[in-house]
């Protein structure tokens, strides 16, 4: 698996015109944010060695390199889901490739439902912690040399980014 990650990252590096440090996974309903990215270089997932292909309707299935708010970024327009039949290694493959490309900050978006009657469509939710109930765990198997076997899950999500997102949401 690690060899495939390196192979894919190497293939992308040969084609990348920028070296972004930030990535965004555009979830359901946010694929249109891709139109806000300027100076784009788009690569369909189907062209990328070892990359899964999204089967969800409305997920375009391409990597987009470009600028958003003046910052070099990498965006995934369309992602892969466990419920599509992919295993966790395949679902997490793009994120592992991003790490090999030098991505340091990852924003993940999605559409979700909630039980709280105070929640409204379009409300922004910020995840501060999670419990993994999936039967298959992405850390299962041989450890990659890129990180610890069992990473510290204390403050899994960046406290400063959470605060920044909350402050921006309050302004809007």
Give the ranges of each region predicted by the language model.
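Active-site-adjacent substrate-binding region
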Residues: 158-172
């Amino acid at each position: 698996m690690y060899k495939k990650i390196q192979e894919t990252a190497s293939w992308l590096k040969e084609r990348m015109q920028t070296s972004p440090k930030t990535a965004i996974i555009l979830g359901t309903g946010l694929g249109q944010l891709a139109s806000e990215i300027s100076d784009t270089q788009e690569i369909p997932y189907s062209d990328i060695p070892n990359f899964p292909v999204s089967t969800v309707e409305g997920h375009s299935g391409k990597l987009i390199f470009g600028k958003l708010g003046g910052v070099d970024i990498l965006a995934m327009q369309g992602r892969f889901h466990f419920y599509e039949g992919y295993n966790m290694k395949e679902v997490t493959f793009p994120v592992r490739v991003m790490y090999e490309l030098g991505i340091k900050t990852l924003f993940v978006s999605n559409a979700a439902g909630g039980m709280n009657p105070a929640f409204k469509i379009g409300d922004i939710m910020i995840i501060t912690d999670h419990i993994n109930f999936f039967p298959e765990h992405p850390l299962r198997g041989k450890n990659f040399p890129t990180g610890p076997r069992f990473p510290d899950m204390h403050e899994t999500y960046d406290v400063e980014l959470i605060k920044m997102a909350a402050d921006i949401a309050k302004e809007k």
